[in-house]
Protein backbone atom coordinates (compact mmCIF):
# COMPACT_ATOMS: atom_id res chain seq x y z
CA UNK A 1 0.00 0.00 0.00
CA UNK A 2 1.32 3.40 -0.96
CA UNK A 3 0.61 5.95 1.79
CA UNK A 4 0.70 9.62 0.78
CA UNK A 5 -0.13 12.62 2.91
CA UNK A 6 -1.36 15.91 1.41
CA UNK A 7 0.52 18.10 3.85
CA UNK A 8 3.54 17.79 6.16
CA UNK A 9 2.67 15.00 8.58
CA UNK A 10 4.52 14.09 11.74
CA UNK A 11 4.08 10.68 13.34
CA UNK A 12 3.35 11.19 17.03
CA UNK A 13 4.50 8.21 19.11
CA UNK A 14 2.85 7.90 22.47
CA UNK A 15 2.31 5.33 25.15
CA UNK A 16 -0.82 3.23 24.72
CA UNK A 17 -0.48 0.31 27.11
CA UNK A 18 2.75 1.80 28.43
CA UNK A 19 4.33 0.89 31.70
CA UNK A 20 1.10 0.32 33.58
CA UNK A 21 1.10 3.63 35.44
CA UNK A 22 -1.97 4.78 33.52
CA UNK A 23 -4.79 3.06 31.72
CA UNK A 24 -4.90 2.76 27.95
CA UNK A 25 -7.76 5.26 27.90
CA UNK A 26 -5.80 7.80 29.98
CA UNK A 27 -2.68 7.43 27.81
CA UNK A 28 -4.65 7.88 24.58
CA UNK A 29 -6.69 10.80 25.89
CA UNK A 30 -3.50 12.58 27.00
CA UNK A 31 -1.84 12.00 23.60
CA UNK A 32 -4.88 13.40 21.79
CA UNK A 33 -4.93 16.51 23.99
CA UNK A 34 -1.23 17.15 23.40
CA UNK A 35 -1.62 16.59 19.64
CA UNK A 36 -4.59 18.96 19.51
CA UNK A 37 -2.50 21.67 21.18
CA UNK A 38 0.46 21.09 18.85
CA UNK A 39 -1.80 21.37 15.80
CA UNK A 40 -3.27 24.64 17.12
CA UNK A 41 0.23 26.08 17.57
CA UNK A 42 1.46 24.67 14.22
CA UNK A 43 -1.49 24.77 11.80
CA UNK A 44 0.88 24.16 8.88
CA UNK A 45 1.34 20.48 9.84
CA UNK A 46 -0.76 17.46 10.67
CA UNK A 47 0.00 14.83 13.24
CA UNK A 48 -0.66 11.14 12.81
CA UNK A 49 -1.63 10.04 16.31
CA UNK A 50 -2.29 6.32 16.82
CA UNK A 51 -4.83 7.12 19.56
CA UNK A 52 -6.97 8.94 16.99
CA UNK A 53 -6.88 6.11 14.48
CA UNK A 54 -6.88 2.86 16.36
CA UNK A 55 -10.58 2.13 16.93
CA UNK A 56 -10.69 -0.63 14.32
CA UNK A 57 -7.43 -2.03 15.66
CA UNK A 58 -8.86 -1.97 19.18
CA UNK A 59 -11.92 -3.94 18.03
CA UNK A 60 -9.66 -6.52 16.37
CA UNK A 61 -7.39 -6.63 19.43
CA UNK A 62 -10.30 -7.17 21.82
CA UNK A 63 -11.54 -10.01 19.57
CA UNK A 64 -8.00 -11.48 19.58
CA UNK A 65 -7.85 -11.22 15.77
CA UNK A 66 -4.52 -9.37 15.67
CA UNK A 67 -1.30 -9.31 17.66
CA UNK A 68 0.94 -6.54 18.98
CA UNK A 69 3.30 -7.38 16.09
CA UNK A 70 0.48 -6.80 13.57
CA UNK A 71 -0.28 -3.41 15.08
CA UNK A 72 3.40 -2.43 15.17
CA UNK A 73 3.78 -3.45 11.52
CA UNK A 74 0.95 -1.09 10.53
CA UNK A 75 2.26 1.72 12.75
CA UNK A 76 5.77 1.44 11.29
CA UNK A 77 4.43 1.49 7.72
CA UNK A 78 2.57 4.71 8.53
CA UNK A 79 5.64 6.18 10.27
CA UNK A 80 7.76 5.53 7.15
CA UNK A 81 5.27 7.56 5.07
CA UNK A 82 5.36 10.54 7.44
CA UNK A 83 7.69 13.51 7.07
CA UNK A 84 8.75 13.61 10.69
CA UNK A 85 8.48 11.93 14.05
CA UNK A 86 8.17 12.89 17.69
CA UNK A 87 7.49 11.01 20.90
CA UNK A 88 5.24 12.40 23.60
CA UNK A 89 7.21 10.70 26.35
CA UNK A 90 4.86 9.66 29.11
CA UNK A 91 7.13 6.91 30.38
CA UNK A 92 8.62 3.64 29.20
CA UNK A 93 6.91 2.05 26.20
CA UNK A 94 8.22 -0.86 24.13
CA UNK A 95 6.18 0.27 21.12
CA UNK A 96 7.52 3.83 21.29
CA UNK A 97 11.07 2.48 21.63
CA UNK A 98 10.58 0.46 18.43
CA UNK A 99 9.09 3.49 16.65
CA UNK A 100 12.06 5.58 17.86
CA UNK A 101 14.53 3.11 16.33
CA UNK A 102 12.61 3.09 13.06
CA UNK A 103 12.39 6.89 12.96
CA UNK A 104 16.11 7.26 13.61
CA UNK A 105 16.97 4.78 10.82
CA UNK A 106 14.35 5.39 8.14
CA UNK A 107 12.99 8.89 8.64
CA UNK A 108 16.48 10.00 9.77
CA UNK A 109 15.15 11.74 12.86
CA UNK A 110 17.41 12.41 15.84
CA UNK A 111 16.59 10.81 19.17
CA UNK A 112 16.11 14.28 20.66
CA UNK A 113 12.64 14.29 19.14
CA UNK A 114 11.55 12.72 22.41
CA UNK A 115 9.46 15.44 24.06
CA UNK A 116 10.02 15.21 27.80
CA UNK A 117 8.28 18.47 28.68
CA UNK A 118 4.56 18.49 29.39
CA UNK A 119 3.32 20.35 26.32
CA UNK A 120 -0.07 20.88 27.98
CA UNK A 121 1.64 23.04 30.60
CA UNK A 122 3.84 24.92 28.12
CA UNK A 123 2.74 28.32 26.86
CA UNK A 124 2.55 29.14 23.14
CA UNK A 125 6.14 30.45 22.87
CA UNK A 126 7.61 27.51 24.77
CA UNK A 127 5.67 25.05 22.62
CA UNK A 128 7.00 26.73 19.46
CA UNK A 129 10.56 26.74 20.81
CA UNK A 130 10.42 23.05 21.77
CA UNK A 131 8.87 21.83 18.53
CA UNK A 132 10.13 24.29 15.87
CA UNK A 133 13.12 22.13 14.82
CA UNK A 134 10.92 19.04 14.39
CA UNK A 135 8.21 20.90 12.48
CA UNK A 136 10.68 22.75 10.24
CA UNK A 137 12.46 19.49 9.32
CA UNK A 138 9.13 17.82 8.48
CA UNK A 139 8.06 20.74 6.28
CA UNK A 140 11.42 20.58 4.43
CA UNK A 141 11.03 16.82 3.88
CA UNK A 142 7.48 17.30 2.60
CA UNK A 143 8.63 19.93 0.09
CA UNK A 144 11.43 17.64 -1.13
CA UNK A 145 9.17 14.65 -1.80
Describe the predicted segments one by one.
Residues 1-145:
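Conserved catalytic or regulatory cores that recognize and/or transform ribose-phosphate-containing ligands
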Amino acid sequence: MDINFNNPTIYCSHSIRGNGSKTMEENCRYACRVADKIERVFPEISLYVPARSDLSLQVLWDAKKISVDDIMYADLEILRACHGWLWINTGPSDGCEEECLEACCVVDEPEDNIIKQDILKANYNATRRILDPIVNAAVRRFRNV
